[in-house]
């Protein structure tokens, strides 16, 4: 898979950056990553992990729910931590849209858990990182768009369907051609 992606990247002149959770653990790290990407001459693609220990917190939330424990307090704690990350990273006017999305995702957690949609819960971390980094880049003067990989990645028999995924990605980014950076 990585060889195929590398070959496609080299052929098309794509530049892909990957930032893990520790690179996005706090507001200063988000701003540093945005500053680094802003300096890139090519149109970069960025793949991000959940910020800091967010995935661990979401996994603990899932485990607590599965043990029939009350999740209201750990969910409130996680919500506060993530909201603080957003407000520390962005000015108020830019943070508002990210907070709206974050609060929507967090409010859906109990329903997702009740219907055993744990992947939806776990996706929150990456969605937040992509949304927050794109907003941070835009705030620093680099047009960026956050993309949800679930909107274009297609799997067949637990393997990526590259043809369908490429078609869906092409359609998805057609409306975002002016963006300098795509964050997934």
Give a label for each model feature.
Residues 1-184:
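Nucleotide/pyrophosphate-binding catalytic subdomain
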